[in-house]
A protein has these predicted regions:
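Mobile "lid/hinge" segments at catalytic clefts and subdomain interfaces of large enzymes
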Residues: 3-4, 68, 151-284, 382, ...
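Non-catalytic terminal/interface segments that mediate subunit docking, oligomerization
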Residues: 76-80, 306-401, 405, 523-659
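Extended C-terminal subregions enriched in glycine
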Residues: 379-429, 435, 643, 649, ...
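Long, structured ligand/cofactor-binding scaffold of large enzymes
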Residues: 8-11, 15, 20-195, 581-633, ...
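Terminal amphipathic helices with adjacent charged low-complexity linkers/tails
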Residues: 42, 46, 51-60, 74, ...
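Acidic, glycine-rich flexible loop/linker segments
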Residues: 488-505, 670-739, 746-749
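Short glycine/threonine-rich loop-to-helix capping motif typified by GTGT followed
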Residues: 47, 147, 151, 243-249, ...
Length: 752
């Protein structure tokens, strides 16, 4: 059954005409990303040549997807909007709250028991408001979306930063915070800064151990974690033909690590085949009829430099297997360089655990190719040195892989098969170790490798590679093992080599599944009661944030001046804290606990200016809030890099932090801060960061004249009585300033 088929038929009936009208209006050929963007304007009459990276534009996405950890807050906000049903097709996916411990057979029932209150809430809200519900064990949100919902030319938002995964099937798919999702769910315009366009020209063909994962790992080394901010990466060139749809999804998925708005591939025969193999023949046919407008125009491809803001050239035939890390996904290292780089940087060279899965690499093809490496180890009698853990991407993939013997190939070398869920990728991993502070190395096919992220150990050096390389390094037990050139010993002491991985893109017998774990949207039913117990520590109804009082912010204590990388993991940790994602008061206890204090080099230890004692960040914030005192956070570049979790914006707002002053922001987090009525400001001169001292009282003036393009003034009152003043800037437009004045975007919408 094709889900939401009437919406899809209606969309394709008008798509090509919308694109043609857009070309006539802007009077030039269009890139593929532009075609999709212009076809989804909230008000088509406002179409014009928007300034990329500058102007905000209102869009009308086709659908919304939410994972269970972020859906709670999104749907709590939606419930306050007073709507009878969602305005567009939507789905909830229970994938984040399942912990990987001993294996799927025991872990899934335990998760259902532990998270029953949250699952019941999400299920009842879904049934009440006409939302599709994918229960625990059904699979990882982005793999399920690719298999069931993604379609060429469409636009979707998702409350997860790796929503761009659907770009592998030709969608503009953007990760957002819950408040943005609520805009779409309630039928309001969804606002986005018109993205810059980075064209990625692919030539050649992958071979040997090189994979689509290595393409994006190489691009991360080129562009870095900030290089894609406020941009769409659009892929083109003859190299596209040799990459499968799931491989393209992998590349789009990790565009999030570049800070990109999203990434997109054009519709082609691989996409058509994927749609047909996943039971969506009619969509493939509809897309084929619109194929000319599901790709960049010929004039663009003939002279890409005239249409893209930046061009990146990648020769696939020269791409090597990469191992990116540790601690940041843009530390790109070809595996052939690791023998020199590892010892030079004092990396722990023994690979203790290899983890295959995540929304990035858990497709049938991923598992089949990784299993071909595992099968060689078994057949050649190679002793596996590390522990191997597998998370399939969906129940359909797990069932099919089990039928085809793929899971058996992993089990024969001692692999542990976990639930169809995120698990270790987001810190939902009960790692069995005798010392959770010991320096060690793990290799994963995941997307992020921030310190502490996987297992909570700050001394775990996590490296990212392809599933195939992850399995090979786990077998070898060495970080510097190059499977293309190095050998291993078999049980008889003979040197043997691993052959390059092989594996079918699609199962030869077709996909199969007994129970997808899906409850289709029912008619909206106002009689369904959504129960939230008053004494619950997992769920809490939201109270509106207070509006701006019309005054400047004077003598705010510095809550923390963070040093170095400060991701959403540092601001609002996942792992054991995921259970509080529906309870703002409780989860606020983890505020900035991973951030490094610039004044002492420690995490979660800041000075409370009221008594001079050093306490946890949330403790200091609560002390200020109890006295009615607003506070401020000062940070470095790319503040809020990482996930879409709006808790990283709601927690400081809840604890009366009014301002985040940073050198620069990650896109999603900056929007989330604005949505929650906070001030996200940047230094005009980044060196002014160095003027901020630990005991400063900080004032922000000029708010009565707060306007697009205006500057505000920060004054630092130092402990010795001296002062420093400097200007700060912002990217707020008129609507976003109205959010600030109303107290939040939701407050503003409620007043309209």
């Amino acid at each position: 059954m094709i889900l939401d088929i009437e919406m899809l038929r209606s969309f394709y009936a008008s798509y090509s005409e919308s694109v043609k009208q857009a070309k006539a209006t802007v009077k030039r050929p269009l890139t593929y990303a532009e075609k999709v963007l212009f076809a989804h304007l909230f008000d088509p009459s406002e179409l014009r040549p928007y300034k990329r990276g500058v102007e905000y534009v209102d869009f009308r996405p086709n659908r919304v997807a939410m994972q269970d950890a972020t859906a709670q807050m999104a749907l709590l906000q939606f419930m306050n909007a007073g709507k009878d049903k969602v305005a567009v097709p939507a789905s909830v996916h229970c994938d984040h709250l399942i912990r990987a411990d001993v294996g799927a057979t025991q872990d899934l029932p335990e998760a259902c028991k532990t998270n029953k209150e949250v699952y019941d809430f999400l299920k009842s809200v879904s049934q009440k408001y006409h939302i599709g519900f994918w229960g625990p064990g059904a699979g990882i949100i982005h793999q399920v979306v690719l298999e069931n919902y993604a379609f060429p030319g469409g636009m979707m938002v998702g409350t997860d930063s790796h929503t761009p995964n659907a770009g592998g099937l030709g969608m503009v798919a953007v990760g957002v915070g819950g408040a943005d999702a609520v805009d779409v769910l309630t039928g309001q315009p969804w606002e986005l800064k018109m993205p810059r366009l980075i064209g990625v020209h692919l030539t050649g063909k992958l071979s040997g151990w090189a994979t689509p994962k290595d393409v994006i790992l190489e691009i991360l080394g080129i562009l870095t974690v900030k290089g894609g901010t406020n941009a769409i990466l659009e892929y083109f060139g003859e190299g596209l033909d040799s990459i499968s749809t799931t491989g393209k999804a992998t590349i789009c998925n990790m565009g999030a690590e570049l800070g990109a708005t999203c990434s997109i591939f054009p519709f082609d025969q691989n996409a058509s085949e994927y749609l047909r193999k996943t039971g969506r023949e009619e969509i493939a046919s509809l897309a084929q009829k619109n194929a000319a407008e599901l790709r960049a125009d010929d004039e663009v491809l003939a002279n890409p430099a005239a249409f893209y803001d930046q061009i990146v050239e990648i020769d696939l035939s020269k791409v090597e297997p990469h191992l990116n890390g540790p601690f940041t996904p843009d530390a790109a290292t070809p595996i052939s360089h690791m023998k020199a780089k590892g010892p030079a940087n004092d990396y722990p060279m023994v690979v203790e655990v290899g983890l295959v899965g995540s929304c990035t690499n858990s497709s049938y093809q991923d598992l089949a190719r990784a299993a071909s490496v595992a099968r060689q180890a078994y057949e050649k009698g190679i002793q596996v040195k590390g522990q191997l853990i597998i998370n399939p991407g969906s129940e359909q993939i797990r069932y099919t892989a089990e039928r085809d013997g793929i899971l058996d190939d992993f089990k024969k070398i001692g692999a542990l098969i976990m639930t169809n869920a995120c698990g270790p990728c987001i810190g939902q991993w009960k790692r069995h170790t005798d010392d959770n502070t010991r320096k060690n190395a793990i290799v994963t096919s995941f997307n992020r490798n921030f310190r502490r992220r996987a297992d909570g150990n700050p001394n775990t050096f996590a490296f990212i590679g392809s599933p195939e390389l992850t399995v090979a390094l786990t077998i070898a037990g060495r970080l510097d093992f190059n499977p293309a050139t190095d050998t291993l010993l078999d049980k008889d002491g003979n040197s043997v080599k691993l052959d390059a991985p092989t594996g079918f893109t699609f199962p030869s017998k077709g996909f199969a599944v007994e129970d997808k774990g899906f409850i289709a949207p029912s008619e909206a039913n106002a009689n369904i009661e959504v129960v939230i117990a008053p004494d619950s520590n997992r769920l809490q109804k939201l109270a509106p944030f207070a509006p701006w009082d019309g005054k400047d912010l004077v003598d705010m204590p510095l809550l923390i001046k963070t040093e170095g990388k400060c991701t959403t993991d540092h601001i609002s940790m996942a792992g054991p804290w995921l259970k509080f994602r529906g309870h703002l008061q409780n989860i606020s206890d983890n505020l900035l606990m991973g951030a490094v204090n610039a004044f002492n080099g420690e995490s979660n230890k800041v000075k409370n200016q009221l008594d001079g004692k050093y306490v946890e960040v949330s403790t200091a914030a609560k002390a200020y809030k109890a006295q009615g005192i607003s506070s401020i956070v000062v940070a470095e570049d790319n503040y809020g890099e990482g996930s879409s979790r709006e808790h990283a914006a709601m927690e400081p707002r809840f604890l009366n932090v009014k301002v985040i002053l940073a050198k620069s922001f990650a896109r999603i987090h900056e929007t989330n801060l604005k949505k929650q009525g906070m001030l996200a400001l940047t230094f005009c001169n980044k060196d002014d960061y160095n003027k901020v001292q630990e005991d400063d009282r900080i004032s922000l003036t000029g708010l009565k004249e707060f306007a697009p393009g205006s500057k505000l003034t920060v004054t630092l009152k130092h402990k010795d009585g001296s002062e420093d003043s400097f200007e700060v800037e912002h990217t707020y437009n008129d609507t976003q300033i109205a959010w600030f004045k109303a107290g939040s975007a939701l407050n503003f919408a409620a007043k309209k």
